[in-house]
Amino acid sequence: MDRFLYYPLSLMPYLVITLIVSFTMHELAHAYVAYKFGDDTAKKQGRLTLNPIKHLDPFGTILILVAGFGWARPIPVNRRFFKKPRLAGVLVSIAGPVSNLILAFIGFFLLVLMHAYGMEMLAAFSTGLDQFFSIWIQLNLVLFLFNLLPLPPLDGYRIIEDLVPPGVRAKMTQAESYGFIVFLVLFVTPLGSYVLWPMLNAGRDSILKLFSAIFQPLL
């Protein structure tokens, strides 16, 4: 069975739990910020909820288990409802990745607390909890960094769209049709192994060092 999966079968329960929570919070963050700025499109579609069924894309979720990458159902956003479309657009786009950064921070904090104060009480579960928190932290950091890449249709691309002049934005909108080709090149060719993943891993490690520095007194 392991040969059909990107991750070991023994880690699947931890991975599935992490994906469900991370994808749900990511999309809910988009929906909530859009709603606060006046766009109730997602709310009307039942997306302003913690129910993961409303946010998970079946194919995208399965794909991440077998190929290492995937996606959730994107939140619909209607910019016409925003009084300040560019500002609201940036904040809506960045809300998703920030939610993953917050989840990673919470996971790191709980892991530190467990090792600092609760290891004796949790000794029987320490190995499993270590594995779970490791997956939780690293996957959320990768989601944070990956979604900030300036590639369509990722959040990083949307942020740039709202920061550039209207003329440039129009050209970026036209270029979105090439997004699938870009992702195909990154994930099917060696380019991803030599460029994308080393970059994401370096960013992840830098954030982990920052977390460690923050919690140094407890380590």
UniProtKB/Swiss-Prot annotation:
It is an enzyme of class 3 (hydrolase). GO terms for molecular function: metal ion binding; metallopeptidase activity. GO terms for cellular component: plasma membrane. It comes from the Bacteria. Zn(2+) binds at residues 26, 30. The active site is at 27. Keywords: Cell membrane, Hydrolase, Membrane, Metal-binding, Metalloprotease, Protease, Transmembrane, Transmembrane helix, Zinc. It is found in: Cell membrane. InterPro entries: Metallopeptidase_M50B, Peptidase_M50, S2P-M50-like. It is a multi-pass membrane protein. Binds 1 zinc ion per subunit. Its cofactor is Zn(2+). The chain crosses the membrane at residues 4-24, 52-72, 94-114, 132-152, 180-200. Its EC number is 3.4.24.-. GO terms for biological process: proteolysis. Belongs to the peptidase M50B family. PANTHER family: ZINC METALLOPROTEASE MJ0611-RELATED (PTHR35864), ZINC METALLOPROTEASE YWHC-RELATED (PTHR35864:SF1). This is Putative zinc metalloprotease YwhC. It comes from Bacillus subtilis (strain 168). The lineage of its organism: Bacteria, Bacillati, Bacillota, Bacilli, Bacillales. The gene is ywhC.
